[in-house]
Each structure stands twice: as C-alpha cells, then as structure tokens.
C-alpha cells in the first residue's frame, strides 16, 4: 500500500495491498477498498462502505456519510460500489436508510463528474455518466448506460431508464423511459429516442425501427397506456428492447415524462 504520511487510515479498515491513499485523506474503520483503487487528496470515505477494484476517487470526494434524512438514527446502513468507476472532485455519496433499501449502490464503469451528488438508497447501474453538479434525491434508480447532463436535478424515487439521456439543467420529477431523450424543467419533456446514443452503442436498424414505432404509439398517438401497449403488441415486431420499454412504462408509480 502507498499511504501518504498525512492520511488517516483507521487500523480496522480493510485495504488491498496496492491501494493508494493520498495526502490528508481519511478512511474510516468500516471501510473496505479493493485492489487497484486510488484515493485522492482530502477525500473522506466513512461508514459501512465497500469499494471494489480499480476505482479512481479524486480529491475532496466524500463517500459513506450519513443520509440527509430526518428518520436516520445512526443505523448500520451501507454504500456498495463496484469496479472501474471514476468519482471526480467533490462528489458525495451518502449511505442508505433503514426505511429505504438500507444500501446505496453504484455499479461498475460509471463516470461521476465533479460535485455530483448521489443520495441515500440510490441504485446506480453500470456505465452511467453524471456530468458536473448533477444531483439525485433519495431512492433514485438509474439504468445502465444512462447519461445525465450538467446540473440535472432528479426528484426522489424517480426511475431513469437504460440508455436514456437527460439534457443539462433539466429538473426531473417523473420517470424517464428507457432509450429516450428528455430535456427541460417545469415540466421536462420527451423529445423522442436517444438516437445518437443508441447508434453509438450499435443498436441495429431493426431495433431502432421497433423502438421508434413504439415511441410514436406510446407517446404521440393519444392512446392511454393500456391501449397503446395492446397496439404495439399487434403492430410492432417484438424484441427485448421493446419489451423492456413496455415493462418500464407499465410499472411506473410516478408516471412517465411525455
């Protein structure tokens, strides 16, 4: 291990042999950090926090602090982080609450940019991008490959679907369907498929066509959700992506952005 002399690492913390802890960082007693992870200057990792392999934790990052929730009574709740993530300067990630999931989870290969905030009980998938100052309320769920622009604010309990894109400065208070492009605030609006993102991830022409047809029926036909789903099942060639979209919309508790 490479631990700077000014860093404070509790003797009970569990660190892999090649972990790097830079100047003035603080590592608490219930922290576990996997191989190849680097913790930058002035970072604080506390609480019951487990961080996987090859993560980059930059300066002034704060992970594992108590949730900003009035119900919290110092229970043993957790942060679980996967592998190959980047947490840029001043990112904050709070641990879960007992009345929530008990654990805030961040998957693998995510890029969380400067001053972003992940609140208690959030569930972040893999390959997610959160640009500078994007902030999540408690209990937010983000699917794989979703992207949030700068200064996006997401209301608690919102779900953000896989491969969706949210434009900078947007305020999100309803669910964002997978594969879609959403921009704006009060209200945010749906602007069609995230076509550029889907093409970058090599979605086939057939899948793109099926998603476009499904989008038009779900959100631009004037039909209610049940009738739109029935129409899609008759008129659109089925595929896993369309099934995921229909399941997401059908299971929404907050309603979806249109």
UniProtKB/Swiss-Prot annotation:
A Pfam family assignment: Hexapep
Reactions performed catalytically: a (3R)-hydroxyacyl-[ACP] + UDP-N-acetyl-alpha-D-glucosamine = a UDP-3-O-[(3R)-3-hydroxyacyl]-N-acetyl-alpha-D-glucosamine + holo-[ACP]
The UniProt record lists the keyword Iron-sulfur: no
Into which EC class is this enzyme placed?
transferase
Q: Give an example GO biological process.
A: lipid A biosynthetic process
Subcellular localization is given as:
Cytoplasm
What is the E.C. number?
2.3.1.129
Q: Does the keyword Hydrolase apply?
A: no
- InterPro entries from the xrefs? Acetyltransf_C, Acetyltransf_C_sf, Hexapep, Hexapep_transf_CS, Lipid_A_LpxA, Trimer_LpxA-like_sf
Q: Which GO terms describe its cellular component?
A: cytoplasm; membrane
Task: Give the GO molecular function terms.
Answer: acyl-[acyl-carrier-protein]-UDP-N-acetylglucosamine O-acyltransferase activity
- Print the keywords alphabetically: Acyltransferase, Cytoplasm, Lipid A biosynthesis, Lipid biosynthesis, Lipid metabolism, Repeat, Transferase
- Check the record and name the CDD domains matching this protein: LbH_UDP-GlcNAc_AT
What pathway is this protein a component of?
Answer: Glycolipid biosynthesis; lipid IV(A) biosynthesis; lipid IV(A) from (3R)-3-hydroxytetradecanoyl-[acyl-carrier-protein] and UDP-N-acetyl-alpha-D-glucosamine: step 1/6
Q: To which protein family does this belong? A: Belongs to the transferase hexapeptide repeat family. LpxA subfamily.
What the entry lists under NCBIfam families is as follows: lipid_A_lpxA, PRK05289.1
What exactly does this protein do? Answer: Involved in the biosynthesis of lipid A, a phosphorylated glycolipid that anchors the lipopolysaccharide to the outer membrane of the cell.
User: Oligomeric state and partners?
Assistant: Homotrimer.
What is the protein name given in its UniProt record? Acyl-[acyl-carrier-protein]--UDP-N-acetylglucosamine O-acyltransferase
Gene from which this protein is expressed: lpxA
